[in-house]
Design a protein with these regions (language model features):
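An N-terminally biased module of ancient metal coordination in phosphate/nucleic-acid-related enzymes
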Residues: 1-62
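Histidine- and aromatic-rich ligand-binding microenvironments
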Residues: 162
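Active-site gating/metal-coordination segments in enzymes
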Residues: 57-58, 66-159
Length: 162
């Protein structure tokens, strides 16, 4: 038996706040074939219990740099040994978004930046990403770029890694 435990690099604990997002509603029904539990938000204790049951030592929670969820930030504040943050950045939002990234990382345990190209229908090779790439290098911050076919029924060509 191994004592190794996993790090889950993409955990969403506030799905209950996303019931209004059309592509997520369609993904719930068409892709995941899920019921109403799909849009369940978790408490800190529920999330830790689920992590322990699954053998997950640490979870990286996604938080938007513009209007970050206090709920998500509280997870990291309450249990910094179990939760870190991935700062969700919009490359189309310009320098103010990058300044928000710096501020968030200065105040909270941000371990990576994250972009989801289908949200903007821009491939990662688009010049609008370049300032983000530069900022991540300056901050010595890894960048997670979502690639492959998206689960939600949205355009996915921009996430084709080939």
């Amino acid at each position: 038996m191994t004592s190794r435990r996993a790090i889950d690099c993409w955990v969403n604990v506030t799905m209950g706040e996303t019931k209004h997002v059309d592509h997520l509603k369609r993904a719930k029904e068409d892709y995941f074939k899920a019921g109403d539990e799909f849009f369940t938000s978790l408490s800190v204790d529920e999330c830790i219990a689920d992590m322990d049951e699954a053998g997950v030592d640490k979870a990286i929670l996604t938080v938007r740099v513009k209007d970050p969820s206090e709920t998500v930030l509280d997870f990291a504040r309450q249990h910094p040994d179990r939760f870190a943050l991935a700062a969700h950045v919009r490359p189309t939002a310009g320098l103010p978004e990058l300044w928000r990234l710096e501020d968030l990382a200065a105040e909270h345990p941000v371990v990576m930046a994250r972009v989801v190209p289908f949200e903007f229908d821009l491939p990662p090779s688009d010049a609008q990403y370049y300032p983000l790439y530069t900022k991540c290098v300056e901050m010595d911050l890894p960048l997670s770029v979502n690639t492959g076919l998206p689960g939600p029924p949205v355009p996915g060509e921009c996430q084709d890694p080939i």
